[in-house]
């Protein structure tokens, strides 16, 4: 059978707290999400839903980020100025206290070939990094966001913490899944699962570092560059595979730019 899961958001509240000092302002934006987490199981032969195995559970999630604004002269505004976003921190969301992110590292990829192993992929230069201690105050300049070449291959390594008890699906003992998605508006695409099973670019089995490759998409038809949002989600497996396992999830969202190579 095949397991599918997703969130049905029923209520979304946003609050913004501002503090102004001279020509700069700081906004703390919080989102409170409430809804239903749905797990659906289908027979892979008939694709019929197996109602006796699927379930749903309520969830709530808090997401926050800080945004810096600067006062900018604008003669078309009656006040003579407007507030423009200059920088923002990553958006961080969590439900429960079981799983969290320790660090995120993004590398370029070095690929080589040999007659025995075929294509070998190795970690290249470090392109972006952050750790849990700095996320809340790591301001990303709007004019200097992490930038990747269109259709470039990159390597993701995400270190996680799982406070347990862990629910594992096999003898490897990994108790969480780590997903990567991207989007421009409310729509998120390209869900891709990283792994901690020592497969592919993951080097060590169950060391709490999930790794994977991601081929960056293009900026869009007729666009030379464009800004997107990445979403890195950590979800405890007991959330997906047990009805009584609660809802424990951690999400990190970072804006980034995709540009065509000249």
Kindly label every feature range from the protein language model.
Residues 164-174, 182-189:
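Solvent-exposed loop/turn segments flanking beta-strands in beta-repeat/beta-sandwich domains
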